[in-house]
């Protein structure tokens, strides 16, 4: 499972270094499927990506919104393989959409990891703090036993 937060820099060529704790999870060849979602990049192992694609087939029948979601989530994904230094080259369009410039944050989220610009990550942290002040949300968290 992907866990933890790492602060890094994206180099001028658009490469990011995969943290060592993520490398074994990605697999021997290190290939990751990366797509844009909710303002950041989501990176999946090929195994997890196959599961997502299988689920997405059903979205075709659920109307225009779901069809568009599938089109952009799957259609914009890019298969990225690291070099010998475990650097992934993020395609320019994905870098631009996610606002990746210099400082980035990698966050492990169980079945995938996310790549955020430092500025957008700070915004997400602020939203989380706001969520934690919401009584209904706090009740949902309590139901999880946390």
UniProtKB/Swiss-Prot annotation:
Protease found in the keyword field: no
Tree of life domain: Bacteria
Domain SpoVT-AbrB, first and last residues per copy: 5-48, 77-120
Record's GO cellular component terms: cytoplasm; nucleoid
Pfam families on file: MraZ
InterPro entries reported for this sequence: MraZ, MraZ_C, MraZ_dom, MraZ_N, MraZ_sf, SpoVT-AbrB_dom, SpoVT-AbrB_sf
Gene Ontology MF: a single term: DNA-binding transcription factor activity
Keyword DNA-binding: yes
Subcellular location: Cytoplasm, Nucleoid
Family annotation (PROSITE patterns): SPOVT_ABRB (PS51740)
Keywords per UniProt: Cytoplasm, DNA-binding, Repeat, Transcription, Transcription regulation
GO terms under biological process: negative regulation of DNA-templated transcription initiation
HAMAP family: MraZ (MF_01008)
UniProt record similarity statement: Belongs to the MraZ family.
Subunit structure: Forms oligomers.
The protein's name in its UniProt record: Transcriptional regulator MraZ
